[in-house]
Regions:
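Secreted/periplasmic carbohydrate-active enzymes, especially glycoside hydrolases
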Residues: 1-160, 188, 198, 203-204, ...
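Aromatic- and acidic-residue-enriched carbohydrate-binding clefts of CAZyme catalytic domains
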Residues: 21-25, 103-108, 116, 161-185, ...
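Active-site beta-loop-alpha junctions enriched in small/polar residues
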Residues: 107, 143, 165-167, 208-210, ...
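Acidic-and-aromatic substrate-binding clefts and catalytic sites of carbohydrate-active enzymes
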Residues: 138-147, 211-215, 237-241
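Aromatic- and acidic-residue-enriched segments that line the glycan-binding/catalytic groove
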Residues: 150-161, 173-186, 273-285
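Active-site neighborhood of glycoside hydrolase catalytic domains
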Residues: 155, 176-226
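Short beta-alpha connecting loops at secondary-structure transitions
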Residues: 169-179, 187, 207, 232-234, ...
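Substrate-binding clefts and catalytic carboxylate motifs of secreted carbohydrate-active enzymes
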Residues: 201-205, 215, 225-315
Length: 315
């Protein structure tokens, strides 16, 4: 019918495209009747792609154009993607067919000047700092991170453990078994997976942090015994700490199935506080006169709030 418009080869532009569509793509070029919402689904094989990895983060760009019946381009969208495989074989996690070691760190969103409000450049500087210290993996403790952060992990080359915003320290023995919370658990994990599953950097999912020891976790432990062991948190960097890293890594480098972990954590969460004499210090619990606080428990990173590395980082 005249009201239908078929997608044309002329409207599909790709930097590496030779102008020939596979049959599966041609068959999927659906006719969409304006203004009814429509969807085009197709799958195809792309030859000679370079696999994405933290060491070689090759990305490709998908270019989409939405065209009205008159042939006018009304919307353009670009999406960077990477190609990689992640499988568990025996007791090893394989990326592109090879076992990997996670030199990881736990990272919270934090800036000593702006608190939890970060710019894209703040995120980039965090990742560049981690690159300088030879980290290759980040756990998004304890919530899904901004998509901009995942985009940067795709670009710069980091393996990411995406963690759902499920945290129930004080009640985890009850909430994880309470059916009233089932919908919330499933929804939070599902929304994270649906949003982030196309980022090549995301290779693992975490269902939450310290959120239960119920029967569900007994079942999960039984399932995990024949899987790789990757520590989501270890070597807590508070005070005079991180002194046994050599022993950890001797074991990691010598035992199959032990594939690294994520140090707690990247940096101290001490915001700048200006004192009466004009000097500035990194503050923590109690420094603002509050009576209920957790003391210096927010200062358990390998770098100070001003990004100066502690001896723990050198260790």
């Amino acid at each position: 019918p005249e009201s239908l418009r078929q997608a044309s080869r002329d409207f599909f532009v790709g930097e590496h495209w030779d102008g020939k569509f596979p049959a599966s793509v041609t068959d999927a070029m659906a006719q969409i009747e304006p203004p009814t919402p429509g969807r085009i689904l197709f799958e195809t094989s792309i030859p000679k792609v370079s696999p994405w990895s933290a060491e070689n983060p090759v990305l490709y760009t998908l270019h989409f154009e939405l065209i009205d019946p008159a042939g006018n381009v009304i919307q353009i969208s670009n999406q960077r993607i990477g190609f990689r495989s992640v499988v568990i074989k025996g007791r090893e996690l394989l990326v592109n067919g090879a076992p990997v070691i996670f030199y990881g760190v736990n990272r919270h969103d934090f800036n000593r000047h702006t608190g939890r409000a970060l710019t894209r450049e703040d995120m980039r500087q965090d990742l560049l700092e981690l690159k300088r210290w030879n980290f290759n993996a980040v756990r998004t403790s304890h919530y899904p991170n901004d998509v901009a952060f995942l985009d940067l992990c795709d670009e710069l080359g980091f393996y990411v453990v995406g963690e759902a915003n499920i945290e129930s320290h004080a009640f985890y023995d009850s909430i994880c078994n309470d059916p009233r919370y089932l919908g919330a658990f499933v929804e939070r994990v599902g929304r994270m997976v649906e949003r982030d599953m196309h980022h090549p950097a995301v290779v693992l999912w975490s269902l939450g942090n310290e959120s239960g020891k119920g029967l569900n976790h007994e079942a999960a432990a039984a399932w995990a015994r024949n899987r790789p062991l990757i520590m989501c948190e270890y070597s807590h960097a508070m005070g005079n700490s991180n002194g046994t890293l050599a022993e950890y890594w001797d074991a990691i480098h010598s035992l199959p199935g032990l594939q690294g972990g994520f140090i707690w954590e990247f940096w101290d969460h001490g915001p700048d506080q200006k004192l009466a004499d004009g000097t500035v210090r990194s503050a923590y619990g109690g420094d603002y006169g509050e009576t209920k606080h957790d003391g210096n428990f927010c200062c358990d990173g390998m770098v100070f709030p001003d990004r100066t590395a502690k001896p723990a980082m050198h260790e």
